[in-house]
Amino acid sequence: MQNRTGLILCALSLLTGFLMICLGGFFISNSIFHSQRNLVVAYVLLPMGFVILLSGIFWGTYRQANENKEMFNHVLRQHLAFQDLPLATVDRPDFYPPAYEESLDVEKQACPAGRELLGFPPPLYTETNLEFEHLEDPQPEAPPPYQEIIADAGAPAKAQDAEEPSRVLKAGTALQLTELTGR
């Protein structure tokens, strides 16, 4: 019976708080009741309604927690009594990497250097690409001198100029002005 009475009182406090908030909002927004006395009543109803509503919410929450507290305590005590909490441990010496001095020992290395075991050094590479150099050709072919490249590139242009003069030279200065101005 006490459980039912507490539930009814909790619901009544929630409803009363909500109604007081609604009445305060109605008195403030309604233009018919714009007297000084109605505004005072409205501004008293609003905070009082919020206080009653919040106290009803907290009261209901406290009642529920208090009713179920004994059940939760019983289950928790029963669970803790039957077993100890498992503790996870870590084997520390295996967890950490080896010391610096141990890592320097060649005998203890798990993966020794492969090329050193075979007895020959890694292959030589060229500067331009990563292909293997041929052992019988230790020096790559030297590039031609700069003057030779210029002479080879200039020869076809001179032959073309000798066969036919350019358009600018044929037309003279008039063509140059039209090309510059775009007219």
From Swiss-Prot:
Keywords carried by this UniProt record: Membrane, Transmembrane, Transmembrane helix
Coiled-coil segments: none
A Gene Ontology term for the protein's cellular component: membrane
Endoplasmic reticulum listed as a keyword: no
Transmembrane regions: 8-28, 39-59
Locations listed in the record: Membrane
Topology of the protein relative to the lipid bilayer: Multi-pass membrane protein
Highest taxon above the source species: Eukaryota
InterPro entries on file: TMEM252
PANTHER family on file: TRANSMEMBRANE PROTEIN 252 (PTHR35682:SF1)
Designated name of the protein: Transmembrane protein 252
Organism: Mus musculus (Mouse)
